[in-house]
Amino acid sequence: MVNSVVFFDITVDGKPLGRISIKLFADKILKTAENFRALSTGEKGFRYKGSCFHRIIPGFMCQGGDFTRHNGTGDKSIYGEKFDDENLIRKHTGSGILSMANAGPNTNGSQFFICAAKTEWLDGKHVAFGKVKERVNIVEAMEHFGYRNSKTSKKITIADCGQF
């Protein structure tokens, strides 16, 4: 299986911040990577485009992917509402690691987070399935709009997304 690369064009209150590209580890974590890839392209009729990063904690992570309710309470995968943890072999080794947000074991949907630092306490609990390939500095810039309480000071949006 080929490791796909997807992109997010990020805006802050409607103004362009930049494009990040993300390599998905489909060779080891196929189902999770395919869910994220398809939600990036919109080929199943729903997608990340227009959704926001609703939770940003500086020094920890930037979380997004709720394209149904846009507030962190919605979750929808290409497989239905939730799907099982595929495997937990990849580690949260540092900034740029892409991982599934969940509400416990086997509750993956559309929400994801991008690590801003090493987060080893998440190993074995969240499926890490990709890594920012280019422009991790955009993720670092996004951190400036977050607070320790996880709120954001500005609207951080995925203005466009797709697959290279």
Curated annotation (Swiss-Prot):
Location within or outside the cell: Cytoplasm
GO molecular function, one term: cyclosporin A binding
Gene Ontology CC annotation, any one: extracellular exosome
Superkingdom field: Eukaryota
EC number: 5.2.1.8
Alphabetical list of Pfam families matching this protein: Pro_isomerase
Tissue: Highly expressed in brain, ovary and mammary gland. Moderately expressed in lung, salivary gland, kidney, skin, adipose tissue, intestine and spleen. Weakly expressed in skeletal muscle, liver and stomach. Expressed in pleiomorphic and undifferentiated liposarcomas, osteosarcomas and breast carcinomas.
Keyword terms, alphabetized: Cytoplasm, Isomerase, Rotamase
Main location: cytoplasm
Catalytic activity reported: [protein]-peptidylproline (omega=180) = [protein]-peptidylproline (omega=0)
PPIase cyclophilin-type domain segment(s): 7-163
Enzyme class, broadest EC rank: isomerase
A single BP term in Gene Ontology: protein folding
SUPFAM superfamilies documented for this protein: Cyclophilin-like
InterPro entries: Cyclophilin-like_dom_sf (IPR029000), Cyclophilin-type_PPIase (IPR024936), Cyclophilin-type_PPIase_CS (IPR020892), Cyclophilin-type_PPIase_dom (IPR002130)
Summary of the function given for this chain in its UniProt record: PPIases accelerate the folding of proteins. It catalyzes the cis-trans isomerization of proline imidic peptide bonds in oligopeptides.
Other information: It is one of six related genes or pseudogenes found in a cluster, thought to result from gene duplication, on chromosome 1.
Protein family per UniProt: Belongs to the cyclophilin-type PPIase family. PPIase A subfamily.
Protein's name in the database: Peptidyl-prolyl cis-trans isomerase A-like 4A
Source organism of this protein record: Homo sapiens
Gene: PPIAL4A
